[in-house]
Every structure is written in C-alpha cells, then in structure tokens.
Amino acid sequence: MRTASERVGRPVSRVEGFDKVTGRARYTADVDVPGLAHAVLVQTEIPHGRVTEESVRRAAEQVGSASGVLHVLTPLNCPALGQLPHELTFDLPLERRPPLSDLTVQHVGQHLAVVVADTLENAAAAASLFTVDYDVLPAQTTARAVLTEPAAPDEESGRIRHGSYLPDHFVKLDEEKLQDRRGEPPERGRSALRVDARYTTPVNAHYPIELSATIAEWNGEQLTVHDSTRWIAGERTALAAYLAIPEDRIRVLSPLVGGAFGSKSFLWMHVVLCAVAARAVGRPVKLVLTRDQMFTSTGHRPRTEQDVRLIADEDGTIVSTEHHTLTETSTVAHFCEPAGLSTRILYTSPHLVVSHRTARINAPTPCFMRGPGEAPGLFALEVAIDELAERARIDPLELRIRNHANADQAGGKPWSGKHLLQCYQEGAERFGWKDRPAAPRSLQRAGVQVGWGMSTATYPGRRMPAGCRVVTDADGHVEFSSATHEVGNGVRTVMTQVAADTAGLPIDRVSFLSGDSAFPAAPYSGASQTTATVGSAVFAAADEWRRRFIAALVDDADSPLFGADPATVDIGTVDPRVAAAYRERLSFSTSSDSGDQSTQAVQSFGAHFCEVEVDEQIGRASVTRWVAVMDCGRVLNPTLARNQVMGGITFGLGMALLEQVPYDDATALPLGEYYLPTHADRPDFDISFLDHPDFHLDPIGVRGIGEIGTCGVPAAVANAIHHATGKRLRDLPITLEDLMIPFEQPGGAA
C-alpha cells in the first residue's frame, strides 16, 4: 500500500532553492580550503605556430621572480602526462594531446603556462608579464579552407593535421548514423516542387553564469578535486589517465553547478594543470577561468553550413530529402555537430541522403551545446519545410501534418510513444493559427510588421546505466545518493520526489545527494537523460528499500505489524524509529541498466508557435508571444518542467537573434563581444505538456525535457519574420542589418 501523499507530478519547490536565494549555496569557487594558493592561466595569442623555447625560458624566469609567485608551470617543466584511453577521446570532445606537452600552437587560447602565487592578485599580475615569441605557421581557420584536404593521422606523433573527414556515427551510437542513405531518387521531372538552399549557423558560446573553477588538493597520494563539472565519474577516469594514478586515489566533488549547457560535461585541460600545479607547490591550488578564457577553453557550438534539398509532389508530399552538413573541429580532438540526425526520422521521405563532413582547423575544440545537432539542424530543416509549403501554397502546419512519420524513418521501429499530431492541434488552437493569413506582410500593429511562425521540436529519449546508494539514518531518515549533478535543472528535487513516492515515505523523510564521485557512478548530466537514467536507479533503490522494510515489518516477531498482509502496509504511517531499527538491512547500493531500446524508437516531440513584431525602420525584431506544446512522457514536476522549456526557448531566441562569437579574420582572435537575451527579450509564454507516460524507456515513464525547448526555436522565429516581412533569412543570427529597410539618400540612392 502506497502513501496517500503522492508527490510525483506535483509542483514541489526546489529542495536547494532556499540556499540559492539566500546565498548559502556554495559553488566550486566558494569552497574554502586552508592554505589555498591561486593559479592563473597564460594562453597563446596565435592560431598556429610554435613558441620559441628561449622566450618561454626567459618569461618563466622573469615571472618566477615576481612578488608572491610560488611556481610557473610551462611546457619546459611540466611533468609528462599520460594518454587518455581511446573510449574517452573517440567522438568525444576530449583532447588527445596532453596539455603543455610541447611548444606547438594549434589554436588561439591554447594553454601555455600556469602561474601560481600566494594571492589571486599576485598571480594575475605575474601572469600579465609572461610574454613569448612565436614562429608563426600558416593557419587554417575555416572549414572551406581545408575541404579538399583529407585528414589523416600522423603515424609517428598520433596527432591529426588539417583536413576534412566523414565521421560514421555520433558519439559511438550505432543508431545515429552521420552518413545515411535510403531509397531511390525520384524520376527526373516527376515532382514539380523543390527547395534547394544553404543555411548557416555561427559559433555559439555556452556562457553559463558560473565560470569554470577548479580546486586541487593533494593529501599524500590522494587527490581531491573540487570542480564545476557535470561528469564527475568521467573526470575521475580522465584525471587518473593523465596523472597515471589509480582512480580510487581521486575524489571529484561538484555539489552545485551554476549552469553549463554542455560546457562542463567533460574534462578540460585547466583541471589537469591545476592538479599538477598543486602537487608542484605542495598546497591546494584554485584556478578560475576568466570570461574571455571560457570562449577558448571549455568548448563551443561549432559553425555549420547546411545544404537542404527537398522535392515534393504538387500536393506537398515529400518524395526526396537531402541534408548535407559541413562543420568544424580542432586538430586535437574528435567532434562532429550532428545537424542532420533529426532529418533522418522526422518526416516521411522515400528517398533520403544525410551526410556530415567535419573539418579539422586551427580552432579550440568544440563540444556539445544545448540541443547538439538538433538546434542548428532543425533550423535548416524547418525553414526549408516552410519554404516548401510556400511553393506548394499549403499552410506550413498542414504540410507537416501531411508528411508526418508514423514510425521511425531511420530504423523502421515503431515509436514508444508519439503524440506530435496532438501537439500540433493543441498548439494551433491555443495560438489561434487558423486566423493566420497566408500572404507575408499581411499583419501590422502600431506601425510595425507582425508575423506568425511555427516549427516542429524533437529530441531523442536517452537512458544510460547508473547507480544509487541508500542509507537509513538513526532517526529513520532515508538518504539516496548518486554521482550525478545539480546543474540548475532541479535533479535533487525530482529525485527526492521519485524516492519518496516509490518508497512510500513522506517527502520530508527523504533526501537526495549528488556531486561526489564516491557515490555510485552515473553518466554526465546532458543529452536530456538524467531523469530517465538516475531516476531509474533511484526508483530501483527506493522500490528495494520498500520491499525490504515491509518484509522486516511483517516477518519480525517483535514488530507491531508481525504477520500482517504486506499489501496493506502503509509505510508512511510507520514510526520512523522503526525503520532505524533495521538500519543495516535498509542501507545498500543498487543500479539500473540502460533499458531496452532495441524494439522501439524513443523520441520526444513538440510544436512551437510564435508571433514576432518587426520594426523595419530600426531593424528590431521582437518576439511577443510563444505557444509550446510538448510530448515528453510523464511530467514529474510541472513547475520545473515549465522552467526547463521556458529557459530552452529563451536559449533558442538568443541563437535566432543575437548570439555569435565574432572573430578577427586576420588573427583568429575572438573579439570579446557576445550578446545574450535578457528578461526584456522574453515573450509571453504559454507552455503545456501532454503528460503521456512512456514506460518503454524507464520505469517512471519520463523522456528528456532539457533540450527540446531550444530545438526548433530559431526556425519558428525565422519563419515568423518571413511572414512579417517577406524576407527569407537563412543565416543565423538574424540581425538588424537583415531587417532594416535601406535608407534612401536624396536623389533616390540607397
């Protein structure tokens, strides 16, 4: 018998919320360690070349004599570091070349030295004195510059030179083919409707509020690392490989992460260097990246150039789809932005070709960013779908409905649960889509153009193995823990809800801890998988705790419930001190696997509808209204779910209208300006969920919700702007220069 107070599905407040709003929450840089020294990174200023050995030696000597300096770590004195195992570097944005391993420069912002001093001020002042000479080599900084040059490994060094290659799969996932083809192309001349266009997206920066920070402390041969990471288990493995020590001698702590969006999913080189520096000076060392260093040291979303070709019959039925992506990675790591993956599954198309080409250039290593692949890829696909609808003279929503895929087009599997048509219907009704005039420039308000646009949202449902530990305290309180992370997504709250409901306990008798590699292992917090992954482990642990407790109650002759029917036991009404009596039996660890994903395709879906106002006199586009309907399985906490989608949409608005990392063409240096949306840029939100549980992926019926809010947003904005202005814009971000009416000079010249 379960407790009557079901918590799953209710808007329970964040369990860590009070600490956050009162300033009591402690992030990595807030950790106070006795005897702390401070480190500052020195980075390279050219995209390709070699630092002269003599200049490094000279700079190190000068800086080493500066006030308060304890140590200067350079390629000339850095201990030899080990190599990462292949499974951590193949298709993951982990650099295979150890930091400070030589004097070769592969990109602007490569780590060149670490200056350690007694205070942060002394470290920063000394680091500013570290100047070197370069032997500059020709740099390749765009994908097109190396497009025809194959990227092959250098057998002697194991490094990769410039060039491009065709990756097979996205992060070793067999079902996510980056090169895919099916069916035969339509007969020439059969189909009258065509779209053949190129869409581009720029470099985007994650820009979390919290800067990446690391504190490394050695206690003999034991290493403790406090780091703003969302993969503590993977970081421990990578650190063990670099430092050539057993994993059980490393503990990684990351109790709270102040935003990540992909930037803190993997071990970045400054973490290793902080540990090396701490060992060198014999005291704890703190290293906090500057905002400028975040642009070059913790990944980014790489540029994409996407060619989309759609062919359809006169009634809008798609008969051929091609989506070709050109993107970039660094010369020292594998990563491909998988922009075409959603195209493989989203709409019916008898003939399909999807390809991805990745170019190795002199740039920092890119990595996952919220909605990797889907965010830029759906921009191209969903704008192309609108262009096709315009050519067919069919409402954009109607065209999507006509080409709706009832099964997974890539693998032929049935969907575990798909209610996209219901998302379309409910979203259109809530938005008032039936009143949309077909012709662009038909709507005006207060002297500005108004447009309505929409798009489809989708993101895979994922689950990986994870573990959970249960400890029953002396007062009967039950503590669940897993080596996952609270990154602002509310995972502690949701896991507490799952644990309480499954165990049959009041929520105030349950807690959930995360952020410690000493807890049972869990994967990185990303890919919208944490709730399904860790939630399954918590569910298994809580269910086992409940089974053990009931068995103890009815089997123990000293129990007041001895001999009772187990089905009638309401654990929530049992005195907590009774649970404490069985502490040893009720403290254990358990795990869950990745679930059965072989027979059905698991995918979340949604529909975005938006209204924009465009003032063509000043080139300003304002998004005024947004309706989103999401099909993401069971909603465990509607407040947190709404916040996730609302944040995701805002994230997508920045991608559509503001965000890009500008580079100086001559030096490849980022110019330091990065525009982000604020509260003033947010529209009126109407966000709803279908709340259809999907128990195929996991026992709690959820699918991922963290990325799907972003996916499709830039396309909906671009489609709405076209409806408002008649301008079809295919390059992100859409800027005021794109929207302004040219100013006419006297005499008619523009």
Regions found by a protein language model. Give the residues of each.
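Flexible, low-hydrophobicity surface segments
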Residues: 1-165, 270
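Helix-loop-helix junctions that connect adjacent transmembrane helices in secondary transporters/permeases
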Residues: 153-243, 404-477, 670-686
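Glycine-rich loop/linker segments at domain edges
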Residues: 15-22, 87-91, 95, 167-214, ...
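C-terminal catalytic domains of large/alpha subunits in multi-subunit enzymes
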Residues: 66, 75-77, 244-251, 279-285, ...
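Short acidic, glycine/serine/threonine-rich loops at helix termini
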Residues: 82-87, 126-129, 236-238, 261-267, ...
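Extended active-site and interfacial segments that coordinate phosphate-rich ligands
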Residues: 12-19, 128-135, 230, 237, ...
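Phosphate/diphosphate-binding loops
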Residues: 118-119, 283-327, 539-560
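Thiamine diphosphate
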Residues: 256, 260-282, 286-288, 491-498
